[in-house]
């Protein structure tokens, strides 16, 4: 078991560790002074945050529905939610462009509304929401399932409405799961490349910039940008661990 554990850790840490230590401090400082890099990282963070906000608004009620209800076809619905995790991400980009094109009824509606998907921030946010939503829903659903339903039932038996019960019982007990879901959604969105490059090469987010610099200039110019993105993702996951740690003592 110890050997397997070491092997797993080595597989994960060796490539990433080598990438992190290879660029010099000078290279990293130079990258952080590069306006194009800063713009792409800022755009990535903004789009990931918007995707997480959308996931919070539309994903929370859906996660609660899945956590608290049994209905015919529930397993099918849960499988549909997981589809963005399973399919190759270039397919996601192609699928989104398909429904957003003028040949599709939805695309014509968007065109009349003046909403552009291809080559726009809106398109990037749509893609990031698509890939990040399953992580938010699954995380929050598990959090709601961990809350004893009897607490909600007692509140309702005492005359509390559904909304009041959710705000006073479910939300205070489930906020950690919701915050963890937001972080998971953002982390996943920050790493997305395959679907974004098809829908919106420009404006350029960080993963697309890394790809462009690698294809144009090689490892030397792409690695420092990649290291910055790795460190941002690492910070998010450290936050996630701190958020989840007290949860073991709850309920």
Locations of regions flagged by a protein language model:
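Membrane-water interface segments at the C-terminal ends of transmembrane alpha-helices
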Residues: 1-26, 35-145, 169, 173-189, ...
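Short coil/turn motifs that cap or connect alpha-helices
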Residues: 72, 160-162
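Membrane-helix/interface signature in polytopic inner-membrane proteins
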Residues: 141-152, 162
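The alpha-helix within a helix-turn-helix
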Residues: 155
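Glycine/proline-centered hinge or cleavage motifs at structural transition points of membrane proteins
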Residues: 158-159, 172
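Extracytoplasmic catalytic/substrate-binding loops of multi-pass membrane glycan-assembly enzymes
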Residues: 204-205
């Amino acid at each position: 078991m110890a050997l397997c554990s070491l092997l797993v850790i080595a597989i994960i840490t060796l490539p990433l560790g080598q990438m992190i230590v290879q660029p010099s401090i000078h290279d990293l400082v130079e990258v952080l002074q590069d306006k194009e890099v800063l713009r792409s990282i800022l755009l990535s963070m903004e789009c990931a945050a918007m995707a997480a906000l959308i996931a919070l608004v539309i994903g929370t009620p859906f996660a609660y529905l899945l956590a608290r209800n049994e209905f015919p076809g529930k397993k099918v619905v849960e499988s549909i939610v997981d589809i963005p995790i399973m399919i190759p991400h270039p397919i996601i980009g192609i699928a989104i462009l398909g429904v957003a094109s003028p040949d599709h009824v939805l695309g014509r509606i968007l065109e009349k509304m003046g909403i552009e998907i291809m080559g726009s921030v809106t398109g990037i946010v749509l893609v990031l929401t698509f890939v990040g939503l399953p992580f938010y829903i699954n995380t929050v659903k598990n959090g709601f399932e961990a809350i004893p339903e009897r607490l909600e039932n007692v509140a309702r038996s005492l005359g509390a409405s559904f909304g009041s019960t959710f705000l006073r019982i479910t939300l205070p007990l489930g906020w950690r799961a919701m915050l963890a879901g937001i972080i998971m959604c953002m982390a996943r969105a920050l790493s997305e490349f395959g679907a974004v490059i098809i829908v919106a090469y420009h404006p350029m987010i960080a993963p697309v910039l890394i790809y462009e610099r690698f294809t144009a200039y090689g490892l030397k110019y792409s690695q420092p940008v990649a290291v910055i993105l790795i460190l941002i993702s690492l910070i998010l996951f450290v936050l996630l661990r701190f958020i989840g740690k007290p949860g073991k003592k709850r309920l």
